[in-house]
Structures are given as C-alpha cells and as structure tokens.
Amino acid sequence: MIENVPGIEENICVETVLSNLSQQYPQMYLNYPLVCNDFEYGYLEGMNSYEFKFASYLVSNSALLVFREPKIEGCFHIPDFYIFNTLSNSGRLVELTLYDSNYTGYRNSRRSYQEVKKSIKRKQEQIEEIKGCGIPYVILYRQQLENIRQRCIKNLF
C-alpha cells in the first residue's frame, strides 16, 4: 500500500487516484506520477526536450498529477501524458505535437519528404486512436504550443 509518493502533496493519496482511474477507465494503465525530483538532471529517457519542459512545468503545480505515457488497451500508439487535476477530480490524455492542426508547416530540413510523410501518417493514426479510446483528451498542436511558449514556458522548443 502506498501511503504517499515522495514529491506529491501529503493530502493526495496516489493509490486512491490510481484505483479510481482504473475503475473509470479500465482500458488505461498508469505508472506512478512524475515528481519534481524526476526533472533534476534536465533529462528523462525517451522524452524529447519540449515534452520534458512541458511536464516539468505541470509537475510544479501541486494540484496536478502528471502520468507519463499511459498505456491504453487497443491502442498501438501511446499518448504523451495523462494529466489529473486533484482539485476538479478529473483528467485528460495529452498529446503534444509540433505539427499544426492541418499537418502542414512542420519544417525539419534533416528529414526526407518520405520520412515526414510517414511521420505525419503515424501522428494522424495516433490521434485517431486517442479520439476513439473513450478517455477525455486534448491534442496540443504547434499553434497551442506556441501560445504556451509565449505565455508560460519560455524556450519550450
């Protein structure tokens, strides 16, 4: 039994949150939430820099539990996060993408046209899986990430 998780406020019972979420969304499997100490080295394996900065910013809000890469039964692609707000007792899957909502405007000169095309197809499939999994979600496209960068998280990407 987990009484508390280091780095999570004492009045938040992570075990209860996980139990409630597993009943509400039995198709979703979560690991323990990220905590501030997870960000002390400036890097988390498998997480790109803008995901790292975004998660670090959210973890600094003690009312939020940030679960990394939730596994969803029937989904081949994994969303970036499941964010749970302990004040509203609700959460959402969160997927970050540097593509805009029309899948245009992504510039990376190091990648061939075929690589970009394949990446766009994968991202579209991932978003369709997220939309169809029965769990509330939000997709943050480049436009929203630009706004977040301007207002909240400088140097997000």
Question: Positions of the model-derived regions?
Answer:
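Nucleic-acid endo/exonuclease domains
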Residues: 1-157
